Amino acid sequence: MFTQKSFEIFSIDGLEARMAEIRSEIQPVFSEIGQKLLTELSAKISNQEFYFHIAQHRRRTANAPENTWSAISTKARGYKMEAHFQLGIWEDYVFIYLSMIDQPKKQKEYAELLTNLSVEKMLTEDFIISKDHTKAEVFPLSAFSEAAERLGKVKKSELEIGRLWPKERFDGKEDSKILAEMLETIDQLLPIYQKLMEV
C-alpha cells in the first residue's frame, strides 16, 4: 500500500531522480493493488479479458511528472483509446477513476450515453470528477452533467469519475479499509463502465 514516502516523491527535483523513485516505490504498489482490482473486474465481467498497464512517462525529456498512474483496459497494447479504470497518485491524494482521456475513439458516443444517464443517482455523493488528467483539481459529482455534455462538444475535453483518498489516510493503520473502499469504488462504477463498453 502507499505510504507517506509515496507522496514525498513528488517533491524530488529532476526527471531522472523522481522517476527512479516512482519506479522503485510507487509502481510496485500499483502492481499490488492493480492485481486485486483486476481480479475484481474479471470476477464481475467474466467474459472479458482485462490488461493492466503502468504509465512509463517515456515522452518526458525535462519535466518530472506531477502525478503517475496505472490503468486497466480491455486492450493489451494501451488504454487511452477507450474508457478504462485508473489507479493513480498526486502529491496529496490517491485516486481511482473511470477515465475517458486523450480523445478516445468513441468520445462522442460516450458523451451521449453519459449525458442521458442519471449518474448522480447511481453513485454515492463522495464520488468526484476530474475534467483534465493533467491537473489535480477535482469537482463534486454535481458537476458531472455539464462535464459529460462538454465531452461531446469539445474535442480535447476529458472526463474522469471516481473517488480519492487524501494522503493523511495512508499512515499504515487503514490499509485494509482503503483497499476495501477501492474495490467498492470499482463495483459502483461497473454499471456505468459496462454501458460505455456497449456503445
Swiss-Prot record:
InterPro entries: UPF0637 (IPR009403), UPF0637_domain_sf (IPR053707). This is UPF0637 protein llmg_1936. Belongs to the UPF0637 family. It comes from Lactococcus lactis subsp. cremoris (strain MG1363).
